[in-house]
Amino acid sequence: MKKKILFGLLCATAGLSLASCGGRDTSHTIVFWNTMGDNLQQVLNPAIEDFEKKYPGWTVESSQIGDYDDVRNQTISYIAAGKNPDLVYCYPDHVALYNKSKQVVDLNTYINDPELGYTEEQIADFVEGYYDEGSAYGDGAMYTLPFSKSTEVLYYNKTVFEEQNLDVPTTWEEMEDVIRILKLRFPESIPLGIDSEDNLFITTAAQKDAPYTSATGDSHYLFDNEQNRATVQMFKDWYDKRYMTTKYIYGTYTSGLFVSTSSERSFMSIGSTGGASHQVPDKNAFEVGISPIPTFEGTDLKCISQGPSLCMLKQASEEKMEMTWRFMKEFLLTTEFQAEFSMASGYNPVLKSTFALPAYEAFLSNATGTEEGITALSAQACLTLSETNSFFVSDAFVGSSTARTEVGKIIQNVLKLGTSLDEAFATAITNCNKDN
């Protein structure tokens, strides 16, 4: 059995063939590139062993290739060299780049196969927002399946909220009232921290149903509109009153401000469910609560879908692609594996049936706002969001990654540098069009 964890480039140069790495024949080896550290590789190893027992003669080589950007960059290099890995962690904008050379497998070929594919009931078991990400490319194809997901939630200091008799805000309008009150009662505080300016812009645009981007049409970049400008101006007003800060302004993740017990602290933090363990103070100095992020009055709640999906890259061998599909479907996207991986990683399962598994129900029963139970509390919040179908994904295309970065910069520049709305939005549109 060949299971190998690598922490850099798989070979010295991208021009080397996969088969030449160590002089091995990889014709019956599924090469799987991901970002899993040792603890998650230990969760993955039994799935690999089970696959290799069921299909003698086939092996899986799992390799940690740094972070998500490293996986993307190395995959692009190997595609250019004509040496595709079989299965890779991906985000939607990564897939759009890979598909410039038409190297991503349309999974509909397998999903709809009467023997290899999914039934309607099995498809319905996927959390809808996670599953829909695979077809967000504007061409009708299905390029990815979800693997492990996260979203953003509102972490709040439950102890302070109860002491101050404050309700947790469910709308941005309520948020403004709460942060105003907290600032009055705790003058040195910065009541609200935001971990991602990019997500803040994209999510609030989705909540307002305001144009952001489109994978089709003559213009991809639609985010310069009055609705989005009004939202940025709202956050600018809050920042000027020291009601809020962001990762860029604070200099690091605002969870550090949230878990602080000094006078300069925050009482709410909008961050990833995947980072729930970082939102708990030392020695459980206060209890943490988790709530959905606010939305605007009169709008539906929408929460961004994040975390890695899986995509298959084209191979000369049809048999190898089929075996890659079998490994993915039969061993990674199962209720049992999803439960184990979620409990170990803190990311959310992608199958709804996982939440009914006795072991996972026991895990959720330990949900508390403490160090011991925060991961389960985070997963519990995500279960609620999945039941209300609140997750969304943005269109993916070549240039969508640039758009994401540029809208985040709008918030950064307007808040911290005092850039005018006209200049900030115009610069962002110009930079997007340069890279299109």
Q: What is each stretch, according to the model?
A:
Residues 26-37, 58-63, 87:
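Short, well-ordered beta-strand elements
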Residues 35, 48, 200-207, 233-326, ...:
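Extracytoplasmic/periplasmic substrate-binding proteins
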Residues 43, 112, 274-278, 308-401:
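Mature extracytoplasmic/periplasmic domains
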Residues 50-126, 159, 163-170, 260-268, ...:
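Extracytoplasmic "Venus flytrap"/periplasmic binding protein-like
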Residues 93-151, 204-206, 289-294, 369-382:
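Hinge/lid segment of periplasmic solute-binding proteins
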Residues 108-126, 210-230, 281-282, 295-303, ...:
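Short, solvent-exposed loop/beta-turn-alpha elements that line the ligand-binding surface or hinge
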Residues 137, 304, 370-431:
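C-terminal capping/gating helix-and-loop segments adjacent to ligand/active sites or protein-protein/ligand interfaces
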Residues 179-181, 218-249:
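Glycine-centered hinge/linker elements that transmit conformational signals in sensory
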